[in-house]
Regions:
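Class I S-adenosyl-L-methionine-dependent methyltransferase catalytic core
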Residues: 1-184
Length: 184
């Protein structure tokens, strides 16, 4: 695991000890940020299930203004902190120690990108997407929710406030993109 591009390019990131996370591969991370391109510059980024912090750190390295990392696992929190220090991005990263679902039940603050990559294949992505749909103020008007799951986990979601706009499959990883539903 490494930072692909930007100010921290080439830095190797620490992994969370154990098997409680499923970090994104460098190949998928590079593909994701090729899709996002320069749009990530000066944005607010939410890494909902932080894990190693690799996705939010990549966003910061490429110019995101600020990233919030949520994780309830103490080892993941320490890994994110170490990786922010390693990449010298600590001043633009914020670690929230706690449950992602409880966080989403709080007062919404808009993010341009919300990255949803739960650690296990237990429909947690559906729960997170449902909570976001109930409080659409979490996503900025021009923002995107990006879900990382195994392709076998995918199922169409009936959402009131968001619509699926794109899917990208990379071997055993599926990225699903959502945005605010357009008014008819």
């Amino acid at each position: 695991m490494r930072v692909i591009s930007g100010t921290a390019k080439g830095r190797h990131l620490q992994a969370v000890p154990g098997d409680s996370t499923r970090p994104i591969t460098d190949r998928v991370k590079e593909a994701l940020f090729n899709i996002l391109g320069a749009d990530v510059i000066d944005t607010e980024f939410l890494d909902l299930f932080g894990g190693t912090g690799g996705v939010g750190i990549e966003a910061l390295s490429r110019g995101a203004a600020h990233a919030v990392f949520i994780d309830k696992n103490h080892k993941a929190q320490e890994t994110i902190k170490a990786n922010l220090e390693l990449t010298r991005l600590v001043e633009r990263g914020e670690i929230v120690r706690g449950d992602a679902f409880r966080y989403l039940q709080g007062v919404p603050q808009p993010f341009h990108y919300i990255y949803v990559a739960p650690p296990q294949y237990e429909r947690l992505w559906v729960n997170a997407l449902t909570l976001l749909d109930e409080q659409p103020g979490w996503l900025a008007d021009d923002g995107e929710i990006i879900v990382q799951i195994h392709p076998k986990e995918y199922e169409v979601q009936a959402l009131e406030n968001f619509e699926e706009i794109e899917q990208r499959k990379y071997s055993s990883t599926l990225l699903v993109f959502y945005e605010h539903r357009q008014e008819a």
